[in-house]
């Protein structure tokens, strides 16, 4: 199994074994750090049913909230890409933007922070603030939600 050091992961959970953190590693504070957020499994690459691996779903704040990577109706028919080229997706097969948080809620998504609180974050949030909420140890504090 692949492993990563805790210092290599900016979020609360990591992709590989050993990459998760404990509360003491959340130096920006648990009320300033996203732990979980909404994802739309059909809106990412890696697998037609979502960005999924044996260990779970991967998502982050690298892409803007609700960035359109959803291969819906006009793009996909069963397991086939629409050959007409009328797809409205933005890089649904890109490692940089595909694993972003996204929701079917209008205007944003629900997030659980490391302190257990739940917040609706607007998709119009300042992108730098959004990224700050996604990093547990950057010493950059986001504006209050």
Annotated model-derived regions:
Residues 1-145:
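Surface-exposed loop/linker segments characteristic of extracytoplasmic
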């Amino acid at each position: 199994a692949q492993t990563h050091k805790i210092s290599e992961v900016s979020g609360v959970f990591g992709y590989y074994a050993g990459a998760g953190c404990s509360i003491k590693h959340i130096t920006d504070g648990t009320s300033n750090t996203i732990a979980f957020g909404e994802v739309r499994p059909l809106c990412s690459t890696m697998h037609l049913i979502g960005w999924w691996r044996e260990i779970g779903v991967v998502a982050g704040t690298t892409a803007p909230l609700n960035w359109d990577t959803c291969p819906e109706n006009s793009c996909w028919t069963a397991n086939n890409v629409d050959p007409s080229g009328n797809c409205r997706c933005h890089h649904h097969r890109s490692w940089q933007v595909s694993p972003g948080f996204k929701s079917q809620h209008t205007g944003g998504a629900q997030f659980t922070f490391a302190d257990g609180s739940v917040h609706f974050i607007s998709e119009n949030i300042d992108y730098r603030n959004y990224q700050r909420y996604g990093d547990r140890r950057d010493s950059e504090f986001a504006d209050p939600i």
